[in-house]
């Protein structure tokens, strides 16, 4: 599965997506897939391991490679964290979330807040909108929501 990508951030996102999809990933296979050294992959996995740890989740390792086993709510938490980190990087963010869908939900939610005369910090709005979008996207891709 050879892939074209533009850099480290994009590669990490693609590896992350494969992990949350349940793939077992070996360093060697990832190095071949992304045309980088095994040491680059080791740094990527280390970065992702820290990301998962921030949500008190763990990547697991066995003879077939690195993998993640978790519930849909755990996937949602770590996916949301990664998305929030990438909000200021449109190209990277668009690999995680459909930007048009995010904008549509964001505008609708903000309109509803104005109509109901509810004030809310922007960080809360971003978090709520992102949660809604992630639920919609994962449900539309037939993911098991638990």
Please place each PLM-identified region on the residue numbering.
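A cross-family "folded-core" feature that marks the main globular domain of proteins
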Residues: 1-146
